[in-house]
Design a protein with these regions (language model features):
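Short glycine-/small-residue-rich Rossmann-like dinucleotide-binding loops
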Residues: 75-77, 101
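Catalytic or ion-translocation cores adjacent to nucleophile or general acid/base/metal-coordination motifs
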Residues: 98
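Short, hinge-like loop/turn segments at secondary-structure boundaries
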Residues: 113-117
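Short secondary-structure transition/capping segments
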Residues: 109-111, 163
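Iron-sulfur (Fe-S) cluster-binding modules
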Residues: 1-72, 82-83, 87-95, 118-278
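Short gly/pro/ser/thr-enriched loop/turn and capping motifs at secondary-structure boundaries
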Residues: 102-107
């Protein structure tokens, strides 16, 4: 994707306001990644000064019709109406950025992909015929073209600000693609996997959280999803050699990014795990 400075190309519907337009969309999610934008605190006023927040129901009822220069999309696709709506969002967006584990990998709700959704519906709802749902929870990229993605559950606010700043300047955002292990080394955190034998997904998880969990003496649970070259099979073997029960290894990979293929191969779709097709 070729990026040009957004400041020189405002949406036609907002020509009276020279700022690029920003829209924030929610699909199947908890709202945590949207709230990251509101939690920018000191930087939020500067963001609002540089971009026009045209659509953001979490923050305001005021809306401006598209098209939009930037769309931040949170959540996975779980219903037929979601699948239709994301097509409309894509058509109305110059640049579409997925934010968070739900949007980039299907989220925790992707656990449904390893079971029969029909069975769940008949057990939970007295009239399942009224429930419109898809058999799987899928990331946004499975339905439309995605220009950029931000990992995490929730995303890191500094990365979000970097993406917005980069798009305004027409450059690629500087988002790390190394593993969480590099962040442990930078902050001088003792490796909990080597020193304590704790199960840790740090070697295969993308950096971005600042190695928060290891800093508090617990293993990484992979909320930023797999890094560019994750050897999850090797890590699963090492975890087993350290004494971690195979069922616990599967559970470790089957959390926030259970639908990401590299994690799915050792979690929901592991050779000794039974996956029920929807």
């Amino acid at each position: 994707m070729t990026l040009t400075p957004l400041a020189v190309r405002p949406s036609t519907e907002t020509e009276f306001d020279p700022r690029p337009s920003l829209a924030v969309w929610k699909f199947a999610s908890c709202d945590g990644c949207q709230l990251t934008l509101l939690n920018c605190e000191d930087e939020l006023l500067e963001v609002a000064d540089r971009v026009r927040i045209a659509y953001f129901p979490e923050a305001t009822r005021a809306t401006v019709a598209g098209p939009y220069d930037i769309s931040l999309v949170e959540g996975s696709i779980t219903t037929p109406s979601d699948a239709e709506r994301i097509e409309q969002v894509r058509a109305a967006s110059r640049i579409l950025v997925t934010i968070g584990a739900c949007a980039t990998a299907g989220g925790i709700q992707a656990l449904r992909n390893a079971a029969s959704v029909h069975e769940y519906l008949t057990v939970v709802y007295p009239h399942p015929e009224y429930i419109a749902t898809l058999g799987r929870s899928t990331p946004i990229a499975a339905h439309v073209t995605v220009d950029l993605q931000l990992r995490g559950c929730p995303i890191d606010r500094h990365q979000l600000l970097e993406v917005i700043a980069a798009l305004l300047r027409g450059r690629r955002p500087r988002i790390p693609t190394a593993s969480v292990c590099t962040e442990c080394k930078r902050r001088g955190t003792v490796c909990v996997a080597v020193a304590e034998g704790m199960p840790c997904l740090g070697p295969v998880t993308q950096a971005g959280c600042g190695a928060l969990c290891p800093a508090f003496h617990r293993g990484c649970y992979g909320c930023f999803g797999p890094q560019d070259t994750p050897n999850t099979a090797s890590l699963a073997s090492v975890l087993g050699d350290q004494g971690t029960d195979r069922r616990d290894v599967r559970r470790l990979f089957a959390t926030f990014n259970a639908g990401a293929e590299a994690f799915r191969s050792q979690g929901l779709a592991a050779p000794d795990a039974q996956e029920v097709a929807p």
